[in-house]
């Protein structure tokens, strides 16, 4: 399974990438919203782990554009924005899960497993359905 992490905090992005790789996932990182959107549109990923506050384009705008283009890529928002209105905004934009920082690695991994099991077909199936 291939996961795209869009996170501007390089230290956290590296920690997430290491955690996911130790679990057997392939994990790539983008550090800004614009490159994150470009990569998420590539149809090679099984899951997007997305921060809300990013340079270039915030995670909410990225998600609206991704969903507006018809993408069904599963999205887990992972952000420090913990207010109710932020969570609602993320879910309304199309996030499948919304997890706040700080987080426990076990909870993050459980959300990822759930996203991968219950949300959307694999990239190959998404491509075939077009």
Where in this protein do the model-derived segments appear?
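N-terminal/domain-start alpha-helical segments
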Residues: 1-117
């Amino acid at each position: 399974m291939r996961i795209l992490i869009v996170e501007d905090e390089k230290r956290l992005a590296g920690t997430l990438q290491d955690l996911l790789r130790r679990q057997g996932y392939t994990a790539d990182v983008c550090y800004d919203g614009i490159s994150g959107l470009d990569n998420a549109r590539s149809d090679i990923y099984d899951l997007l782990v997305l921060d809300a506050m990013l340079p270039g384009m915030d995670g909410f705008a990225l998600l609206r554009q991704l969903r507006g283009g018809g993408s069904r890529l599963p999205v887990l928002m992972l952000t420090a924005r913990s207010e109710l209105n932020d969570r609602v905004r993320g879910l309304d934009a199309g996030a499948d899960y919304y997890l706040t920082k700080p987080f426990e690695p076990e909870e993050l991994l459980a959300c990822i497993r759930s996203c991968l099991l219950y949300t959307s077909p694999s990239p190959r199936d998404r491509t075939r359905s077009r």
